[in-house]
């Protein structure tokens, strides 16, 4: 399958003896994930996405679980622990011109207007007020607010971000 996939959840440990597994969504709501349509799974030992069929997603209190079709015991379910759940990138909503998916920022090189390197984006922190790029360069880590005031340019095709930021901020 040559489609580009986006990870939307990760499978955790088994939950019940009937093969139910913990599901850790990478979105704010399970409803958002369900709206994407067909889900695909990538087992930890492979790099192949396979379509899921007949799975059930259950929400109990603030926890989410997945029951995979034809998996009826915890021992069989264990091979799915740490598997990724994804959807084809085309299933995601189109973004406005000034919007990006966080996953597209991961791996971007970050330099300032003086061409000083902050390394690459390894994570994004959601603070409530704004997002913060977590950049790593060698043994140093830099936190750069992801707001228009500091982002000079982004070229996600070439994975480059230019910021108006200094080492000592």
Swiss-Prot record:
Gene field: rimM
Keyword rRNA processing in record: yes
Domain notes: The PRC barrel domain binds ribosomal protein uS19.
Domain PRC barrel: 97-169
GO terms for MF: ribosome binding
Keywords of this entry: Chaperone, Cytoplasm, Ribosome biogenesis, rRNA processing
Subunit comment: Binds ribosomal protein uS19.
Species this protein is from: Francisella tularensis subsp. novicida (strain U112)
Main function: An accessory protein needed during the final step in the assembly of 30S ribosomal subunit, possibly for assembly of the head region. Essential for efficient processing of 16S rRNA. May be needed both before and after RbfA during the maturation of 16S rRNA. It has affinity for free ribosomal 30S subunits but not for 70S ribosomes.
Protein location: Cytoplasm
GO cellular component: cytoplasm; ribosome
PANTHER family, per the entry: RIBOSOME MATURATION FACTOR RIMM (PTHR33692:SF1)
Name of this protein: Ribosome maturation factor RimM
GO biological process, alphabetically ordered: ribosomal small subunit biogenesis; rRNA processing
Family, similarity comment: Belongs to the RimM family.
């Amino acid at each position: 399958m040559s489609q580009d996939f986006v990870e939307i959840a990760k499978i955790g440990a088994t939950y019940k003896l009937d093969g139910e597994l913990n599901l850790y969504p990478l979105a704010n709501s399970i409803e958002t994930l369900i709206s994407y349509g067909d889900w695909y799974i990538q087992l930890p030992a492979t790099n192949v996405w396979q379509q899921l069929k007949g799975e059930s997603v259950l929400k109990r209190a603030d926890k989410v679980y997945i029951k995979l079709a034809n998996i009826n015991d915890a021992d069989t379910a264990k091979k799915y622990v740490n598997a990724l759940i994804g959807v084809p990138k085309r299933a995601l909503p189109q973004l406005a011109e000034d919007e990006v998916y966080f996953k597209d920022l991961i791996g971007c090189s970050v330099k300032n207007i003086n061409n000083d390197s902050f390394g690459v984006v390894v994570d994004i922190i959601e603070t409530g007020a704004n997002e913060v790029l977590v950049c790593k360069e060698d043994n140093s880590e830099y936190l750069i607010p992801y707001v228009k005031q500091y982002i000079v340019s982004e070229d996600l095709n070439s994975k480059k971000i230019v910021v108006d930021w200094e080492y000592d901020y």
